From Swiss-Prot:
<keyword id="KW-0539">Nucleus</keyword>
<dbReference type="GO" id="GO:0032040">
    <property type="term" value="C:small-subunit processome"/>
</dbReference>
<keyword id="KW-0677">Repeat</keyword>
<protein>
    <recommendedName>
        <fullName>WD repeat-containing protein 75</fullName>
    </recommendedName>
</protein>
<dbReference type="GO" id="GO:0003723">
    <property type="term" value="F:RNA binding"/>
</dbReference>
<keyword id="KW-0853">WD repeat</keyword>
<feature type="repeat" description="WD 1">
    <location>
        <begin position="4"/>
        <end position="43"/>
    </location>
</feature>
<feature type="repeat" description="WD 12">
    <location>
        <begin position="532"/>
        <end position="572"/>
    </location>
</feature>
<dbReference type="Pfam" id="PF23769">
    <property type="entry name" value="Beta-prop_WDR75_2nd"/>
</dbReference>
<dbReference type="GO" id="GO:0005730">
    <property type="term" value="C:nucleolus"/>
</dbReference>
<feature type="repeat" description="WD 5">
    <location>
        <begin position="193"/>
        <end position="230"/>
    </location>
</feature>
<dbReference type="InterPro" id="IPR019775">
    <property type="entry name" value="WD40_repeat_CS"/>
</dbReference>
<dbReference type="InterPro" id="IPR036322">
    <property type="entry name" value="WD40_repeat_dom_sf"/>
</dbReference>
<feature type="repeat" description="WD 10">
    <location>
        <begin position="431"/>
        <end position="477"/>
    </location>
</feature>
<feature type="repeat" description="WD 4">
    <location>
        <begin position="145"/>
        <end position="184"/>
    </location>
</feature>
<feature type="repeat" description="WD 3">
    <location>
        <begin position="90"/>
        <end position="131"/>
    </location>
</feature>
<dbReference type="InterPro" id="IPR015943">
    <property type="entry name" value="WD40/YVTN_repeat-like_dom_sf"/>
</dbReference>
Length: 832
């Protein structure tokens, strides 16, 4: 029976960090950026995500600091709201309901006004600049109805509008026009440039920035020029100076906090710093990795940050040195490798920069590293062909990685330039090292590749199978006796197979690795992996095989396949008969490696639907429709580090693995049965006590040993001074030492409690000590006067300080034995 449960589709991260300009906190400790419908707060010193502010229902389009409170942040969204946040604690303070779609946001320090670019009548073709009066209300939600139009026709890009010094004017560019509006006088000025010139100039505006303390406006243009405008409060007496270094369009401009420097960036991946007033002495920060999309400056002027088209943010100090990098999930044009999981790190692996594989942590929503596969310099220029990564696969243990790279644009098989590389993971270097390079492994494009499960047997050589459009599948095995010294290994072709010269499209191994299934157009062939003999063929209904997989665990006797004409078929390998067939157009067929479950995603009427089933049963045990409004391209099950145990039967398929899927717009989504509060715990709650601070990698290495040593020292200190140790752990002392000073009561109030907590209680004596004291008292009472006289004489012969030291150093039982020895009569010795 299909279950209906509250499993929601949630964004797993990977949203664009370069969608809007980032914002520094007033002290420069935090960097705030837009990430889809989230707002993320990062630490500039550690690059760790401190908070993920969630409250908007749609894409966040603008963020700005509250000029009247530097600990608060304004944000706007396409959901028609403006929200006020306390970003240091991750708390939503207030929501202003406006009802129009916002594209960007600007704040004013003079009045309770914010400026925003909105769509005219929700029409995406035109936009306007408006001012919104934010009402003062005690309620958490309130409506803002006072909206005034300032400029009718503006660009929808936030970088094309800027607020002037002291909020005296606003400048906006669109096309070849520069518009300036003064708020107090309500006068507007409009300047125009010719679109082109005889020298080949392209004067279309791309960005505008205003000087923080002078009447100067900087504009960037398509031809790479920068113009500095002055005297723009006169229509005929205005002037501008031109700066030119960029060979392509200027993508962003920003003045420093004091206005002494102008920063510019473009597709050259170079940050240019122009000294204001002496622009010929410009400085450069090259090789930033990707085109610069946005530039931000901290309020105190000590930090810059650049947002790049590869979804990366670089934090830069004033000496033009990169001090930190925040890398998000890199989104390319097409994800050809699909979604892969690294068995070692449990990281998501897919196409990254051209010719690279990116490893991405799904747990922390953070980029780990890039693996350069092609190992060629990438030149950003239109029309150039370059080697592109098209296929990748890991072995079951993660020791081996196979990649296939092809020359971009090479469609003709005769001119095809292709390489397959085998990479081995080295424990010493903790990285993949190239082991074998195979030029042109097939005569045509490779369609799929997969490793055989290595299992626990070390005798079996690692095996890789590739299929190609040349109608062949090839078996590659690791040869450990490659050289005469038998000290190196390499991959060699061990077997070549085919079926009636049909194109080989898919391949997969059974769970135990004994069988190999290869699809040739509309036919599936099953081969024995020990001898590579053809054992069985299965014919599908008319339609080419799109996906192919074996069942796992209790369903390992089944083989499941989907076709491009809308069928899913399941065969029983024991009877070699069709077990069942269902009519469903499956774009994705993904098995769970830790269970018998198989996920199917189909697309109908622009909506994608999810079905989960087991091969032994044709009816799905879970269905969720309308998971997204786009076509799902790839999906993958990622094993959970800590399995969950949920009683609900409808949630049990999420116990061991998490299903992630990638849409056409490259949004990474997943399924969760937890609420938003459970998934996103504010870091302020996690850091409420000292023990819950996140550990560092250094602490993971040495923390256990130090913890054991500390426990030993604590045990010794408890035996030496139990009362003081208990006093230090007293809540009164902890309150004084750990409570922030600005919230503590006066010292006179805490003095009595604090001093009393340090006193040694008489009741702290143990029962054994009290018994020993009673025995000592009884022995003292039984001692005669002669013994007391001898003790007094012995005390006179030895200094009192020495006796105190001895008494203090001796334990109770030794002191008791010493007193008995002193009472012994040794007078008989004198008679000898």
């Amino acid at each position: 029976m299909v279950s209906q449960c509250q499993i929601r589709v949630v964004r797993s991260g990977g949203s664009k960090l370069d969608y809007r300009r980032s914002v520094f906190s007033a002290d420069g400790k935090y960097l705030i950026c837009v990430s889809g419908d989230f707002i993320k707060v990062y630490s500039t010193s550690t690059e760790e995500c401190i908070h993920a502010l969630q409250g908007h229902r749609k894409l966040v389009t603008g963020i700005e600091l509250n000029p009247k409170n530097h600990l608060q942040l304004y944000s706007c969204s396409l959901d028609g709201t403006i929200k006020l946040w306390d970003f240091t604690d991750g708390i939503l303070i207030k929501t202003f309901l406006i009802g129009c779609k916002f594209l960007s946001l600007y704040t004013s320090a003079t009045d309770d006004l914010v400026f925003a670019v909105t769509l005219k009548n929700n029409d995406s073709a035109s936009s306007q600049l408006v001012s919104v009066k934010l009402p003062k209300s005690a309620s958490q939600e309130c409506e803002a109805k006072e909206i005034s139009v300032i400029i009718e026709d503006v660009s929808h890009l936030p970088k094309c509008t800027a607020i002037g010094r002291q909020c005296l004017y606003v400048a906006s560019v669109k096309g070849v026009h520069l518009s300036i509006y003064y708020f107090k006088t309500k006068k507007s000025f409009r300047f125009s440039l010719k679109a082109t010139s005889k020298k080949g100039a392209n004067n279309i505006f791309t960005v505008v920035a205003c000087h923080p303390s002078e009447d100067c406006i900087a504009t960037g243009h398509m031809d790479g020029r920068i113009r500095l405008w002055r005297n723009f409060n006169h229509k005929k007496e205005y002037t501008y100076t031109s700066l030119h270094w960029h060979h392509d369009s200027v993508m962003d401009l920003a003045f420093s906090a004091q206005g002494t420097k102008l920063l510019s960036g473009g597709v050259e991946s170079v940050l240019v710093q122009w000294p204001y007033g002496s622009e010929e002495k410009k400085e450069f920060l090259p090789r930033l990795g990707a085109a610069i999309e946005h530039i931000s400056v901290s309020p105190h002027g000590t930090l810059y940050c650049t947002s790049h088209t590869d979804n990366k943010i670089s934090i830069i100090d004033t000496s033009l040195k990169v001090s930190g990098i925040i890398q998000g999930l890199l989104k390319g044009t097409v994800v050809k490798t699909g979604l892969i999981v690294d068995p070692r790190s449990n990281a998501l692996v897919l196409n990254g920069k051209p010719g690279h594989l990116q490893f991405y942590s799904l747990l922390n929503d953070r980029h780990l590293y890039n693996l350069d596969i092609v190992q060629q310099e990438f030149i950003h220029q239109a029309g150039l062909q370059y080697m592109d990564l098209v296929k990748a696969s890991f072995s079951s243990t993660g020791r081996w990685l196979a990649t296939v790279e092809e020359l971009q644009g090479g469609e003709d098989s005769m001119d095809l330039e292709m390489q397959m590389k085998l990479w081995e993971y080295q424990d010493k270097s903790q990285s993949f090292v190239l082991n074998t390079t195979i030029n042109r492994p097939h005569e045509d494009h490779i369609t799929s590749l997969c490793f055989r499960d290595e299992g626990n047997s070390e005798k079996e050589a690692p095996t890789l199978v590739t299929t190609g459009k040349d109608g062949l599948f090839k078996v590659w095995m690791l040869n450990n006796n490659y050289d005469i010294y038998k000290q190196s290994s390499s991959w060699l072709c061990d077997f070549v197979g085919g079926y009636h010269k049909n194109q080989a499209t898919n391949c997969c191994f059974s769970e135990d690795g004994s069988l190999l299934a290869v699809s040739f157009d509309e036919i599936i062939t099953v081969w024995e992996s020990s001898t590579w003999d053809l054992k069985q063929t299965f014919c599908q209904p008319p339609g080419k095989i799109r996906n192919l997989c074996f069942g796992r665990m209790s369903c390992s006797k089944y083989l499941v396949a989907s076709t491009n004409n809308g069928f899913i078929c399941c065969w029983n390998l024991l009877t070699c008969a069709l077990e069942w067939r269902a009519q469903l157009d499956a774009t994705v067929l993904q098995p769970d490696p830790l269970s018998e479950n198989i996920a199917v995603v189909s697309c109908s009427k622009r909506w994608s639907n999810l079905f989960l089933f087991q091969p032994s049963e044709p009816r799905p045990f879970y269905t969720q429709k309308n998971i997204c409004q786009e076509k799902v391209q790839w999906a993958v099950f990622v094993p959970k580090e800590i399995p969950e145990f949920v009683k609900s039967e409808s949630h049990q398929w999420l116990n061991k693995s998490q299903l992630y899927f990638l849409t056409e717009k490259q949004d990474l989504l997943t399924f969760s049965s937890k609420s938003t509060e459970e998934r996103l715990t504010p870091l302020s709650k996690q850091l409420a006590v000292e023990e819950s601070l996140p550990v560092t990698p250094f602490h993971l290495l040495l923390g256990k040993k130090r913890q054991e040593e500390q426990e030993k020292l604590d045990a010794q200190s408890v035996r030496a001074a139990p009362s003081f140790h208990r006093g230090y752990q007293n809540s009164a002392i902890r309150e004084v030492l750990h409570t922030p000073a600005h919230v503590l009561p006066p010292a006179s109030v805490l003095c009595t409690v604090f001093v009393n907590s340090l006193l040694i209680s008489k009741k702290s004596q143990s029962t054994e000590e009290s018994k020993e004291d009673e025995e000592m008292k009884s022995e003292h009472s039984e001692a005669d006067s002669s013994d007391e006289t001898e003790e007094m004489e012995s005390q006179k012969r030895f200094p009192s300080a020495f006796s105190l030291d001895v008494a203090a150093m001796l334990p109770k039982f030794q002191e008791k034995e010493l007193r008995r020895i002193r009472r012994t009569d040794y007078s008989w010795i004198s008679s000898l």
